Regions:
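Short acidic/glycine- and proline-prone juxtamembrane loop motifs at membrane-interface regions
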Residues: 240-248
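Membrane-interface anchor segments at the N-terminal boundary of transmembrane helices
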Residues: 55-58, 68-81, 189, 193, ...
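Transmembrane-helix motifs of polytopic, lipid-linked glycan transferases
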Residues: 193-216, 254, 481-485
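Transmembrane-helix signature of polytopic, membrane-embedded enzymes
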Residues: 209-231, 495-498
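Membrane-interface transmembrane helices that cradle and orient dolichyl/undecaprenyl
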Residues: 217, 255-274
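Membrane-proximal stem/loop segments at transmembrane-domain junctions that anchor or position
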Residues: 151-152, 343-448
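Short hydrophobic/aromatic helix or loop-helix immediately within or flanking a transmembrane segment
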Residues: 140-143, 158-186
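Start-transfer (signal-anchor) and selected internal transmembrane alpha helices
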Residues: 1-122, 321-331, 552-553
Length: 554
């Protein structure tokens, strides 16, 4: 009897344990499915936002003359139609496959990059000119810093007190000019030397873009991305103006590439090294072009959601310690790098007044200016300069921001939003020649026929420029057409895809809120191109499925 009772109790305990285990397994499956659904929800949100955003942009393209560029030969509406026809022709004849040999890729990439650099040098040598606005200020600041001219530094102190965001660019450029002086000035034109250095950076960005693009599209499309990049960015007129726009191109794509490498590597030591590098590049990029940090912010957001899901579904002490280690490495690296850069900025020699520095309120105030449609305005700058106290200036600018929004009303805000979007994203030449005193000083023509042709092709007031502008605008419109199709997939977005989507959307939102200018998009063109070719691949897949379905119906 005793044995029977013990056996019965044992069986009941075993059954109870089995029930508990089944319940536990069921709970874990439900929790896992919920986590999976949450991950799917994030993908759906990003896809939907991308579609809505770029459909809005394409509606602006089709509106007509309200948002037309002045230098192109064909209307945006006609380019939109021609772009669709051109893509259909491309699909019909795009049958060639490119070999995947890494050696062939690297050799081809090196040769292509060398050819691009030679073309860039020819363009820079023949068309370089002196412009005004911030480019001129940075150039003179770097020049005076390189030769140690105290009077020149004193004269430029007011500008850099107002715009301290350009100080690190002066550090970089003045270092290059100092090296040129130490070598006996092999380059007598310092602006030419800086433009060449910038061209090299843009060239490196193209190499990184190709390597990065292979993680999102086929090798064949990665080559096409590189080719389009070479046209839109590599041989753009902006390469001859050494400034943060050209220097900043490398940072968004480099941040994305390093993030991909972090996710691909298996060794913890290697991963820590990449995290350290990512943190350094994020800080350097911020001091060269502040909004490049949007990519880094996107990485932080996506990785935070990833870690949170892992901790909920499969908590472990090791996982938590790994996360804390990565955070500590990143934070310490960024603090050290930030301290070093601030020290270098102070060492230049400008007499800076911190109370004169314009904060984010100033750029938000510009962003809601109806007169300039969110662009630079002399009156806004004069208003900001009239205050010597930072706190008072920020307060008055916030008051003016509220007043402008109230005066616009809902209809006015919508109109401003549309105008800013068209101004920011519909110009494939990125505002070339639109800034005040853009062609301030044009150097004497080189003694060759090519110089005359290139200047006519690039200078906005010459005869051939309209053809250059039209070609670039046409290519850019095709890019805009393709981007929404990047969302046309049933697959859940991978982490690197989420970062790409979020970074582009975040950047576009940034320009819609703060000061707008088409040339700001120049920095993010590599990310736009990847999205466009992802969309192209998705569209091609959808069309193939459609025609396959039609043939089966017959």
């Amino acid at each position: 009897m005793f044995l029977f009772i013990c056996n019965t109790n044992y069986n009941m305990a075993a059954q109870g344990k089995a029930v508990v285990n089944k319940c536990g397994e069921k709970y874990m499956k439900i929790e896992y499915q919920e986590n999976k659904n949450r991950q799917g929800i994030l993908s759906v949100i990003l896809k939907s936002l991308l579609i809505v955003t770029f459909l809005f942009i394409e509606i602006l393209l089709l509106i007509g003359s309200v948002f037309e560029g002045k230098s192109v030969l064909v209307s945006n509406r006609m380019m939109f139609i021609l772009g669709i026809i051109g893509y259909c022709i491309y699909l019909a004849f795009n049958r060639k496959k490119i070999p995947r040999s890494v050696i062939v890729e690297n050799v081809g990439l090196a040769v292509s990059s060398l050819i691009l650099l030679v073309v860039q040098l020819i363009i820079i040598y023949n068309i370089i000119f002196q412009t005004s606005w911030d480019v001129e200020a940075v150039w003179y600041g770097a020049h005076w810093a390189a030769i140690g001219d105290k009077l020149g530094l004193e004269q430029m102190s007011e500008y850099f007190s107002l715009c301290p965001n350009n100080l690190f660019l002066v550090v970089i450029f003045s270092s290059i000019l100092k090296l040129n002086n130490m070598l006996g000035e092999p380059f007598s034109n310092g602006g030419l030397l800086l433009a060449i250095f910038q061209a090299i950076m843009i060239n490196l960005a193209g190499l990184i873009l190709f390597k990065c693009a292979k993680r999102f599209v086929t090798v064949a499309n990665a080559w096409k991305i590189y080719f389009v990049y070479s046209i839109l960015v590599g041989i753009s007129g902006w390469i001859v103006l050494p400034y943060s726009d050209g220097m900043g191109v490398i940072f968004p794509i480099l941040l994305l590439y390093i993030y991909i490498r972090i996710r691909e590597c298996n060794g913890e030591v290697q991963r820590c090294g990449y995290i350290l590098l990512l943190s350094v590049i994020a800080v350097v990029g911020y001091y060269v072009k502040p909004y490049t940090s949007i990519v880094f912010i996107a990485i932080i957001v996506i990785e935070t959601t990833n870690w949170w899901k892992k901790l909920i579904s499969n908590y472990s002490r090791t996982m938590l310690l790994t996360m804390m280690r990565n955070i500590v490495i990143g934070v310490i690296t960024m603090v050290v790098c930030n301290t070093l850069i601030l020290g270098m900025n102070r060492s230049v020699g400008f007499d800076l007044d911190k109370e004169r520095a314009m904060g984010w309120q100033h750029y938000l105030m510009i962003g809601v200016n109806v007169e300039s449609w969110g662009g630079y305005n002399d009156a806004d700058l004069a208003f900001a300069k009239s205050f010597n106290d930072k706190e008072i200036r920020n307060k008055r600018e916030m008051q003016l921001i509220v007043e402008r929004i109230q005066n616009m009303g809902v209809k006015g805000c919508a109109e401003l939003f549309a105008h800013k979007a068209s101004k920011n994203f519909l110009d494939g030449n990125w505002g070339w020649g639109t800034d005040k005193s853009f062609y301030k000083e044009i150097y004497p023509s080189r003694s060759n026929g090519l110089c005359t042709y290139l200047r006519s092709w690039y200078y906005g007031f010459e005869n051939l420029y309209c053809y250059n502008a039209t070609i670039r605008q046409f290519i850019w419109i095709i890019v805009l057409i393709m981007i929404p199709f990047a969302s046309f997939t049933l697959k859940t977005l991978q982490s690197e895809q989420k970062v790409l989507f979020l970074a582009v959307l975040g950047f576009m939102l940034y320009l819609q809120i703060f000061e707008s200018h088409a040339r700001y998009v120049f920095v993010f063109v590599p990310l736009f191109l990847i999205l466009a070719f992802v969309g192209s691949e998705n569209l091609k897949t959808l069309l193939n499925l459609f025609f396959q379905y039609k043939s089966e119906q017959k």
